[in-house]
Amino acid sequence: MASILARRSLNTLRARHLVLSGQALQGSHLSRLQSRGISYGSNKDDEEAEQLSKEISKDWNTVFERSINTLFLTEMVRGLSLTLKYFFDPKVTINYPFEKGPLSPRFRGEHALRRYPTGEERCIACKLCEAVCPAQAITIEAEEREDGSRRTTRYDIDMTKCIYCGFCQEACPVDAIVEGPNFEFATETHEELLYDKEKLLENGDRWETEIAENLRSESLYR
C-alpha cells in the first residue's frame, strides 16, 4: 500500500515538474526575443525553480508521512493506546446483581400500600390517586364500614400501564400508596404485573422500614 502511494505521488511530481519546465522554457524563449528582458526572465526562472524545489520537498514529506502511517499503523496504535489507558483506570461500574449502588430516597420503584402501626390500613378510599393517575392504571372500589369509615374492597394497579410518575404518592393525604425502593420485580407473564390489594399490602409490609425512613428524610420537601 505504501509503495502504491509513493509511486502515485512520484508520478504526480514528475508531471508537475514537466509542466513547470515547459513553462520555464517558453518564458526563456520569449526573453531572448526581448532585448531588455533577459535579466528579468532569469530571475523569474530562478524563483520558479526555487518554488518547484519547495513543492517537491513538501510533497516528499507528505509521501513519507503517509508511508509511515500505512506501514506502522499509527492510527491503530493511537487507538490501542487509548484503550490501554482506560484499562488501568479505576472501574466506574459495579458487578450487578452481586453489587448494588445506593438509591435516592426519592426513588420510585414498586408500588405498595401501607398500614398504621396498629395494623389498620391507611387507605381511606378517597380515590385521589385513581383520579390523578395519567395512565389510568389504578382501579379502586370501596364501601362504608359499620363505624362510618370508608375502606377499599378493591385496589388494583396495572403495572404495565404505570409510568412511575409518582402522582399517586403525591396526591395521597395519608401516605397510603407509595412507590417503594424495590426495582427488581420482573415477571414472566403479564398477569403477574396486575397487582391487587393483597399484593400491594404485602409489598408494604415487606418494605415498611425503608419506606418510612425515606418519607421521614424527605418530609421537609413534601
Swiss-Prot record:
It is found in: Mitochondrion. Transmembrane segments: none annotated. [4Fe-4S] cluster 2 binds at residues 133, 162, 165, 168. Its EC number is 7.1.1.2. Binds 2 [4Fe-4S] clusters per subunit. InterPro entries: 4Fe4S_Fe-S-bd, 4Fe4S_Fe_S_CS, NADH_quinone_OxRdtase_chainI. NCBIfam families: NuoI, PRK05888.1-4, PRK05888.1-5. Belongs to the complex I 23 kDa subunit family. This is NADH dehydrogenase [ubiquinone] iron-sulfur protein 8-A, mitochondrial.
